[in-house]
Regions:
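Acidic helix N-cap motif at the loop->helix transition within catalytic regions
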Residues: 4-7, 32-40, 81, 85
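Short, acidic, metal-binding catalytic loop of nucleotide-sugar glycosyltransferases
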Residues: 11-20
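A conserved acidic beta->alpha catalytic loop
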Residues: 27-36, 53, 77
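Glycine-rich, basic loop-to-helix element that forms the pyrophosphate-binding segment
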Residues: 51-68, 89
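Short aromatic/hydrophobic "clamp" motif used to bind/position activated sugar donors
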Residues: 73
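The conserved acidic donor/metal-binding loop of glycosyltransferases
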Residues: 77-81, 105
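Conserved donor NDP-sugar-binding/catalytic core segment of glycosyltransferases
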Residues: 85-116
């Protein structure tokens, strides 16, 4: 049920400077106009999957991991926004460095897309590993991941309704995968009372 912010979010992906991507949108049995909004976009890069019932975030993200055709997976929540060079910069990072997951710093916005703050995550693998005992150290909506690495550790644990991202990061670290954050604001994460 993300109709309120969905157009802005989809447009932020379609307007990327890097154009060679598939936009896989999974509707988790919404009861608003989300599907109609998604179908209104005339862009062959968009593929919509509709769950037959509400399956929850972890299962839905695993469906996305299985169905995505790309080598790299960038995720975004329906109410968040990508900056124009997000995909380009994260792809360049993963092509240059032996990392499995890369996030970024975050612009915090309100329900009207006005900036209300900034979040600086640790950037290098060692700092992120050390921070994981305190907090996630990555904004889930900001990550791009190597699909094969994430699948090799079983994807998202379906036993969690929340913190499934934190669990994934911890398991990635335990398997020796490196995690980084680009020290740039590549996403805007929306803070509102409908979350």
């Amino acid at each position: 049920n993300g109709e309120k912010y969905l157009v802005e979010s989809i447009e932020s992906v379609l307007n990327q400077t890097y154009k060679n991507f598939e936009l896989l949108i999974i509707d988790d049995f919404s009861n608003d106009q989300s599907v109609k909004i998604i179908k209104s976009f005339n862009d062959k890069r968009i593929q919509i999957i509709q769950n037959p019932k509400n399956l929850g975030q972890s299962i839905t993200m695993n469906i996305g991991l299985q169905l995505a055709r790309g080598t790299y997976i960038a995720r975004l929540d329906q109410d968040d926004l990508c900056q124009k060079e997000r995909l380009k910069k994260q792809l360049e990072f993963l092509l240059k460095y032996d990392y499995s997951i890369v996030g970024s710093w975050v612009i915090k916005i309100n329900k009207n897309s006005k900036i209300i703050g900034y979040y600086h995550h640790p950037t290098n693998n060692e700092e992120i590993v050390n921070a994981m005992g305190i907090n996630s150290a990555l904004a889930h909506s900001s990550v791009m991941m190597r699909k094969k690495d994430i699948l090799s550790i079983g994807g998202y644990s379906e036993k969690y309704k929340i913190v499934m991202d934190w669990d994934l990061w911890i398991r990635a670290i335990k398997h020796g995968f490196k995690i980084g954050n680009i020290a740039e604001y590549l996403i805007s994460a929306r803070m509102h009372n409908e979350q």
